[in-house]
């Protein structure tokens, strides 16, 4: 019998229904230790806070080996990037922008008012964040799609001031990659910074108003969103509180719930495509079919080596963060998937919609064989900035809501306040905060005068 070449580790959970604690111990999970790089990143953030753009440029030259002539990319450079871009890429970007905008425009919540009789209303309104910094990475790959996924929901929320920051590229004159600039142009973003890494995050958070040229004044933002490497994530942790952040994103991940009828070639390619991002990327198959597990492993082993990024893919698939989980049945597969809480979850089963309805924890759910994760990465219309490392148990992906602040507007007239005053005073006394009660009483003590 021909020996099967195995790429992915197999975890056999058959024979019992695992508990949540057991699953958190045994499921493949990689992740990164952000604490390990804080001693490197903290001095960078502090120096940029103190010295501004000069420090950011120094660190960019040290880490990226390139120093742009200015941090703010000139408008003519942005214009030229779009003019020079392949028309097919331009059309693809436009189509993705249109679909993402269509989805995110529908997410806008409506203002609503609750009334407690005449003269007592609580109105919840939604106010957009004023200024947002959007980070577009430029490491193993270039991500104009991330520009779209961050900019569009911010625009739909009504954010008035947007800046995109992306690493300068030595091969492109010290400016960010042209596709990043072109995407910004298509989206109507006019402020782009040639800055990456932890220094970009710090500069977005603290800004710099010391420049002689007013065009180079770099105003701080109120929120920073967008993916990045471990150093970017560590910097976001350090500036959190000074600004808001979307999340501390870890390495990307996919989990696939599949049964015996699933196509092993499709699953293999979906696992490979996610592993292509990063050597720390996680690719996990959860199945009740031992035969499917074996066939997927064979297909992965046969096909990964012909990809352009084969070494990266191989390391990711062989890592502790990737694997195949065998279970007794689909209900158990759902339990496992919920415990794993994948960034991306694909469902390849009979009645896949019914299975998807049972899922509680996932950044995004891709239902059926014709809804692969790469579709969501680019052009489905959904957002690809999603919670990682199990955080989908309590958080969700980037959306229009991310950039909106729900604010309660309270209005009570004299009659309405009088009606509830005894309740307020009683609670104030119960908490031993008598001045709270006096603030109510004083409004009615001389009411007849």
From Swiss-Prot:
A GO cellular component annotation in the UniProt record: cytosol
EC number(s) per entry: 1.1.1.23
Residue numbers binding substrate: 252, 274, 277, 344, 377, 431, 436
Catalytic activity entry: L-histidinol + 2 NAD(+) + H2O = L-histidine + 2 NADH + 3 H(+)
Signal peptide: none
Pathway as given in its UniProt record: Amino-acid biosynthesis; L-histidine biosynthesis; L-histidine from 5-phospho-alpha-D-ribose 1-diphosphate: step 9/9
One annotated GO biological process: L-histidine biosynthetic process
Coiled coil: none
Cofactor-binding details, from the entry: Binds 1 zinc ion per subunit.
GO molecular function: histidinol dehydrogenase activity; NAD binding; zinc ion binding
Active site, UniProt feature: 343 (proton acceptor), 344 (proton acceptor)
Protein's UniProt keywords contain Plastid: no
Binding sites annotated in the UniProt record for NAD(+): 135, 199, 229
One Pfam family here: Histidinol_dh
Main enzyme class: oxidoreductase
Protein's UniProt keywords contain Zinc: yes
Cofactor(s) listed: Zn(2+)
Binding site residues for Zn(2+): 274, 277, 377, 436
UniProt keyword list: Amino-acid biosynthesis, Histidine biosynthesis, Metal-binding, NAD, Oxidoreductase, Zinc
Family listed: Belongs to the histidinol dehydrogenase family.
Functional summary from the UniProt entry: Catalyzes the sequential NAD-dependent oxidations of L-histidinol to L-histidinaldehyde and then to L-histidine.
UniProt-recorded name of the protein: Histidinol dehydrogenase
Source organism of this protein record: Corynebacterium diphtheriae (strain ATCC 700971 / NCTC 13129 / Biotype gravis)
């Amino acid at each position: 019998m021909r020996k099967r070449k195995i790429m992915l580790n197999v975890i056999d959970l058959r024979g019992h229904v695992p508990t949540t604690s057991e699953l958190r111990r045994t499921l493949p999970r990689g992740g990164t230790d952000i604490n390990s790089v804080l001693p490197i990143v903290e001095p960078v953030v502090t120096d940029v806070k103190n010295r501004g753009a000069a420090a950011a440029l120094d660190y960019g030259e040290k880490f990226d080996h390139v120093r742009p002539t200015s941090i703010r990319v000139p408008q003519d450079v942005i214009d030229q990037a779009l003019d020079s871009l392949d028309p097919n890429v331009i059309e693809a970007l436009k189509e993705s922008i249109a679909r993402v905008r269509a989805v995110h425009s529908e997410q806008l919540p409506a203002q609503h008012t609750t009334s407690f009789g005449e003269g007592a209303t609580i109105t919840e309104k939604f106010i957009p964040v004023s200024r947002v910094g959007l980070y577009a990475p430029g490491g193993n790959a270039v991500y104009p799609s991330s520009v779209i996924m961050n900019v569009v929901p911010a625009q739909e929320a009504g954010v008035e001031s947007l800046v995109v920051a992306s690493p300068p590229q030595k091969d492109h004159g010290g400016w960010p990659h042209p596709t990043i600039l072109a995407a910004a142009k298509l989206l109507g973003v006019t402020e782009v910074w040639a800055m990456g890494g932890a220094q970009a995050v710090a500069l977005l958070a603290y800004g710099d108003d010391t420049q002689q040229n007013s065009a180079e004044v770099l105003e701080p933002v109120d929120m920073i969103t967008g993916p990045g490497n471990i150093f970017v994530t560590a910097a976001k942790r350090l500036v959190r509180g000074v600004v808001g952040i979307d999340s501390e994103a870890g390495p990307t991940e996919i989990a696939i719930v599949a049964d015996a009828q699933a196509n092993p070639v499709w699953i293999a390619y979906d696992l490979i495509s996610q592993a292509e991002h990063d050597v720390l990327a996680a690719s996990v198959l959860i199945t009740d079919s031992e035969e499917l597990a074996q066939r997927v492993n064979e297909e992965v082993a046969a096909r990964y080596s012909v990809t352009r990024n084969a070494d990266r893919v191989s390391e990711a698939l062989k890592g502790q963060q990737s694997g195949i989980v065998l279970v007794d049945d689909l209900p158990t597969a759902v339990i496992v998937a919920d415990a794993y809480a994948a960034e991306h979850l694909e469902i390849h089963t009979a009645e896949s919609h019914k299975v998807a309805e049972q899922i509680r924890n996932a950044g995004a759910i891709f239902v059926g064989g014709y809804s692969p994760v790469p579709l969501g990465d680019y052009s489905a219309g959904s957002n690809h900035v999603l919670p990682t490392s199990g955080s989908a148990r309590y958080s969700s992906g980037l959306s229009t809501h991310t950039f909106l602040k729900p604010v309660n507007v309270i209005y009570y007239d004299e009659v309405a306040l009088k009606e509830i005053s005894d309740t307020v005073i009683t609670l104030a006394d119960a908490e031993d905060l008598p001045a709270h009660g006096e603030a109510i009483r004083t409004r009615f003590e001389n009411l007849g005068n």
